[in-house]
């Protein structure tokens, strides 16, 4: 990538800002070393990796920030046999191994999203776990980087001897100092070490009295440091022990280095992976801080779309940054931006260049959602004043040199940024030259952004296909830039307006306006009108956005309320169904107990009893069918529930007492048969009156108030008069018909979904006089089997239950035995 253009954009400064978010010096260096790439596949993959790290940083578990020592050079030396690491380098190596092990474990934590870790698998696989080697180093080397005494038995003994010998030597020197005359002693000095030997200080004039070896003297020469003859032997012994200690330390370091040398490739790979992860972490943190949205990438021929773009360096400075939107479509190759000075044109060019280049480095750019960038093969920039006295280049010559390089090198996949095109020379010639350059680049297909003050260049968009005008909005009242980019509208320079604002003599301003060519004046009026209309449309757009936001908020509120209403309806329905289920279970229990009592008391044949029991059960099921969904009307339910209980009790009593049910004889003495439509008294319902709906054999369906029950004919007596009309509660919905089945399969259901299925199957089985019901629940965890067992224990219609035999499904099936 063009280093000259990157320098103009201050790209290294931007990378240094991002690198400041790394946790280690190697990681920061890796960020600073990033260069724009042209491989679209790599760029997209690198951004995906940054997004993965960003997601992990924002997750509950966070990101593992382990220390990464800078041991690139020691790692290169590790490959060479015979070379050893120093104690400090070994300690740094242990730190690296520990960071590798911990980061490896963190990235493989099953609690982390697998989809995110998939982008980082190449780094996770490169990390190593060499804990034994790590611990061996930490046992031998202390935190201060020195080899511990217990690194080896020999070292422990040598250092013990050294300490003892040095102690003896110091005591000897102190005794020798005590023998000196008072005027030969140096009162404020004591035994010390000079040039690796233990010595005692004394006055120079005492030299002839003591003898020995002088190892040093003070700056004035008045004090000398002497090793007396009596201390020489001890000093030699200390030196021998120091040499022996150093030899043993080197042996320990060599042994530790040799232990990790076979793993130099793995350790180097782990180091590179940790550095790469730290680089990704720095970029992810920058993306979070700068609120960078994910972007897509395309070919330069398709143009690009920048949404809420912000200048990265201005953003880094912490000041207020006005975002901009910019779209260049496939057929638009050149954008010519015009407007007054200090309007932000140069800042816009640099922002586009920086955004494109940082994205091609794998660094998220400060953009909004739906942005799409192009992948350029190179960047060319002619921005700023590059005059050079040494090179004898004027400003105009420097511009021409850069423009010549651009014309020679730029391709259809390049990005070209040109600031103040046509400036530095005669405006007419500058406009002609600038127009020719832009026309050449446009016809070549090079994506170009240029700024200018020359009015003639603004007309280029009408002559050359692919050239579009743009301007940075300027407040004509305040004479201050708004930095809002307007595509399709050329900008005015506002030179005379600014001069008037700065109180240049009005007569001068008026004369200047008179001297303007008529075409220029007409163009200025036209642009002013366009700007006013644009401002009006912008205001209306803002008002519409406010209204739309209010509408969205209102719709969201309505949606929330609707959800709450639906939830309340579902809760009411659940409560009603639970109440209905409880009521039916109680009713079934009462009837079954009544049948059991009758069976014990009645002296009837078994078959006759079974017939009456079946009739009683049918009455219960039909009463349940009439109930349906009406249980949702909780306020009207109480009276009806009591009537149903009475009906069930009456049916059971009728089944047990066949003497009931003879109809009253009319006065003539003939027996009048009961039929459909007759009004009757139901003896089993405490004499309540009803109307026969239908007759089937020895049973009749009778409408009693809001209920319809099935009772034996013998329990009915003709009523002399029609019953008093009763308020009939509307019944909404019906209990669905349940087909008789010998087995029900509840596999795949949740535990709280089993009840309805099993109860419906039991109802159908009892209604059709089945003796067994197979409930298939599967083996699994046993939760469904336990729930089925609990239900069967509580249901009085079930006389017993067992697990299935080997040919019935085994432990995956429960067989319920019915009365």
UniProtKB/Swiss-Prot annotation:
One biological process term in Gene Ontology: mismatch repair
GO molecular function (one): ATP-dependent DNA damage sensor activity
Highest taxon listed in the record's lineage: Bacteria
UniProt KW keywords: ATP-binding, DNA-binding, Endonuclease, Hydrolase, Nuclease, Nucleotide-binding, RNA-binding, rRNA-binding
Ubl conjugation keyword on record: no
EC top class, as a word: hydrolase
EC number(s) given by UniProt: 3.1.-.-, 3.6.4.-
Subunit structure, interactors included: Homodimer. Binds to stalled ribosomes, contacting rRNA.
Family label: Belongs to the DNA mismatch repair MutS family. MutS2 subfamily.
PANTHER family to which the protein is assigned, alphabetical: OS10G0509000 PROTEIN (PTHR48466:SF2), OS10G0509000 PROTEIN-RELATED (PTHR48466)
Protein name (record): Endonuclease MutS2
Species of provenance: Gemmatimonas aurantiaca (strain DSM 14586 / JCM 11422 / NBRC 100505 / T-27)
Lineage, highest ranks first: Bacteria, Pseudomonadati, Gemmatimonadota, Gemmatimonadia, Gemmatimonadales
Gene it is expressed from: mutS2
């Amino acid at each position: 990538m063009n280093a000259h253009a990157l320098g103009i954009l201050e790209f290294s400064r931007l990378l240094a800002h991002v690198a400041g978010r790394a946790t280690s010096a190697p990681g920061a260096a890796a960020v600073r070393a990033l260069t724009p790439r042209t491989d679209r596949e790599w760029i997209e993959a690198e951004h995906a990796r940054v997004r993965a790290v960003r997601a992990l940083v924002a997750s509950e578990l966070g990101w593992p920030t382990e220390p990464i020592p800078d041991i690139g050079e020691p790692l290169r030396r590790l490959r060479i046999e015979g070379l050893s690491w120093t104690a400090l380098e070994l300690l740094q190596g242990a730190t690296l191994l520990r960071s590798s092990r911990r980061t490896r474990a963190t990235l493989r934590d099953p609690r982390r999203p697998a989809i995110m870790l998939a982008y980082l698998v190449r780094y996770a696989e490169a990390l190593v776990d060499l804990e034994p080697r790590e611990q061996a180093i930490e046992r031998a080397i202390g935190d201060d980087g020195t080899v511990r005494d217990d690194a080896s038995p020999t070292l422990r003994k040598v250092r013990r001897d050294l300490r003892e010998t040095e102690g003896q030597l110091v005591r000897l020197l102190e005794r020798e100092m005590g023998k000196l005359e008072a005027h030969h002693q140096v009162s404020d000095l004591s035994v010390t070490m000079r040039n690796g030997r233990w010595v005692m200080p004394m006055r120079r004039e005492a030299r002839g009295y003591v003898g020995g070896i002088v190892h040093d003297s003070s700056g004035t020469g008045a004090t000398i440091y002497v090793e007396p003859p009596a201390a020489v032997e001890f000093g030699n012994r200390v030196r021998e022990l120091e040499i022996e200690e150093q030899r043993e330390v080197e042996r320990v370091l060599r042994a530790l280095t040799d232990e990790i040398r076979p793993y130099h490739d793995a350790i180097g790979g782990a180091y590179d992976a940790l550095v790469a992860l730290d680089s990704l972490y720095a970029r992810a943190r920058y993306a979070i801080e700068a609120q960078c949205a994910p972007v897509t990438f395309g070919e330069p021929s398709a143009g690009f779309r920048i949404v809420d773009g912000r200048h990265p360096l201005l953003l880094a400075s912490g000041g207020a940054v006005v975002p901009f939107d910019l779209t260049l479509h496939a057929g638009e190759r050149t954008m010519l931006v015009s407007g007054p000075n200090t309007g932000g044109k140069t800042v816009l060019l640099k922002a586009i260049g920086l955004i494109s280049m940082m994205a091609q480095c794998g660094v998220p750019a400060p953009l909004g959602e739906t942005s799409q960038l192009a992948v350029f093969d190179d960047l060319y920039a002619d921005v700023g004043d590059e005059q050079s006295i040494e090179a004898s280049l004027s400003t105009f010559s420097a511009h021409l040199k850069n423009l010549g390089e651009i014309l020679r090198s730029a391709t259809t996949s390049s990005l070209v940024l040109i600031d103040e095109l046509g400036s530095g020379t005669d405006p007419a010639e500058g406009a002609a030259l600038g127009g020719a350059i832009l026309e050449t680049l446009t016809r070549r297909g090079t994506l170009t952004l240029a700024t200018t003050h020359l009015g003639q260049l603004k007309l280029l968009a009408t002559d050359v296909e692919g050239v579009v005008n743009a301007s940075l909005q300027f407040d004509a009242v305040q004479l201050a830039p708004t930095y809002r980019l307007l595509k399709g509208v050329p900008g005015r320079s506002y030179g005379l307006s600014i001069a008037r604002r700065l109180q240049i003599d009005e007569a001068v301003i008026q004369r200047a306006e008179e001297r303007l060519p008529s075409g220029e004046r007409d163009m200025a009026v036209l642009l002013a009108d366009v700007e006013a209309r644009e401002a009006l449309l912008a205001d209306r757009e803002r008002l519409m956005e406010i209204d739309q936001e209010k509408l969205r908020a209102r719709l969201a509120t309505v949606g929330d309320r609707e959800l709450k209403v639906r939830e309340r309806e579902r809760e009411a329905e659940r409560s009603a169904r639970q109440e209905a289920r409880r009521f039916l279970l109680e009713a079934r229990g009462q009837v079954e107990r009544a049948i059991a009592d009758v069976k014990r008391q009645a002296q009837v044949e078994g078959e006759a009893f079974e017939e009456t029991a079946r009739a009683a059960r049918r009455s219960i099921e039909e009463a349940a069918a009439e109930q349906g969904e009406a249980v949702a009307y909780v306020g009207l339910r109480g009276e009806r529930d009591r009537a149903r209980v009475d009906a069930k009790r009456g049916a059971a009593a009728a089944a047990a007492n066949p003497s009931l049910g003879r109809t009253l004889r009319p006065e003539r003495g003939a027996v009048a048969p009961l039929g459909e439509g007759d009004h009757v008294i139901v003896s089993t319902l405490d004499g309540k009156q009803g109307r026969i709906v239908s007759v089937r054999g020895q049973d009749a369906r009778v409408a009693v108030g809001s209920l319809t029950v099935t009772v034996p004919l013998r329990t009915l007596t003709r009523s002399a008069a029609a019953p008093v009309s009763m308020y009939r509660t509307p019944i909404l919905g019906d209990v669905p018909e349940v087909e008789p089945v010998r087995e029900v399969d509840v596999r795949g259901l949740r535990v709280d979904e089993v009840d309805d299925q099993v109860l419906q199957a039991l109802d159908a089985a009892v209604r059709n006089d089945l003796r067994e019901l197979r409930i298939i629940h599967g083996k699994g965890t046993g939760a469904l089997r336990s729930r089925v067992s609990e239900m069967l224990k509580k249901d009085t219609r079930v006389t017993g239950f067992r697990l299935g035999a080997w040919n019935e499904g085994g432990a995956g099936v429960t067989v319920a035995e019915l009365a």
